[in-house]
């Protein structure tokens, strides 16, 4: 199962999974990706849970 948490450090709309992933790694998550949240794309960090 994968748990997601919105990134606290990522600023602005998320268009690059690579950038999101890099920011999530600084937040001690193994990976991250952009996901649609209402009208905005946000960076979500993921880990196995």
Swiss-Prot record:
The keyword rRNA-binding does not apply. Keywords: Antimicrobial, Defensin, Disulfide bond, Fungicide, Plant defense. One of its GO terms (biological process) is killing of cells of another organism. The keyword ATP-binding does not apply. It holds the Pfam family Gamma-thionin. InterPro entries: Defensin_plant, Scorpion_toxin-like, Scorpion_toxin-like_sf. It comes from the Eukaryota. Disulfide bonds join 3-49, 14-34, 20-43, 24-45. Has weak antifungal activity against F.graminearum and F.verticillioides below 30 ug/ml, but not against A.consortiale B.cinerea, H.sativum, F.culmorum, C.graminicola and D.maydis. Belongs to the DEFL family. This is Defensin Tk-AMP-D1.
């Amino acid at each position: 199962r994968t748990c997601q948490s919105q990134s606290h450090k990522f600023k602005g709309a998320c268009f690059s999974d690579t950038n999101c992933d890099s920011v999530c790694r600084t937040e001690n998550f193994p990976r991250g990706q952009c996901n649609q949240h209402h009208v905005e794309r946000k960076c979500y960090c993921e880990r196995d849970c």
